[in-house]
């Protein structure tokens, strides 16, 4: 996927099993992740549906790259 905006380098929907493992490792429930609406341009670009977990890779001036995860919610 090409560069989208605001330093975002990559946006992908992670597979359900990978999302389960991630949540288990982080000791979180899905709703405890930050949310992103399905209507958000980043979510639409990735083809995300409510209930999916997005992996977003951004440029960071201090870390080089920052990886964040978002739960896709309706809207």
From Swiss-Prot:
Family per record: Belongs to the archaeal Rpo5/eukaryotic RPB5 RNA polymerase subunit family.
The organism of origin for this protein: Pyrobaculum aerophilum (strain ATCC 51768 / DSM 7523 / JCM 9630 / CIP 104966 / NBRC 100827 / IM2)
Subunit structure of this chain's protein: Part of the RNA polymerase complex.
InterPro entries: Arch_Rpo5/euc_Rpb5, RNA_pol_subH/Rpb5_C, RPB5-like_sf
A GO biological process held by the record: DNA-templated transcription
GO cellular component: cytoplasm; DNA-directed RNA polymerase complex
Function recorded in the entry: DNA-dependent RNA polymerase (RNAP) catalyzes the transcription of DNA into RNA using the four ribonucleoside triphosphates as substrates.
Lineage: superkingdom: Archaea
EC assignment: 2.7.7.6
The name this protein goes by in its record: DNA-directed RNA polymerase subunit Rpo5
Single GO molecular function: DNA-directed RNA polymerase activity
SUPFAM superfamilies membership: RPB5-like RNA polymerase subunit (SSF55287)
Keywords recorded for this protein, A-Z: Cytoplasm, DNA-directed RNA polymerase, Nucleotidyltransferase, Transcription, Transferase
Primary location group: cytoplasm
Catalytic reaction(s) noted: RNA(n) + a ribonucleoside 5'-triphosphate = RNA(n+1) + diphosphate
Enzyme class: transferase
Keyword flag Nucleotidyltransferase: yes
Keyword Transferase: yes
Compartment list: Cytoplasm
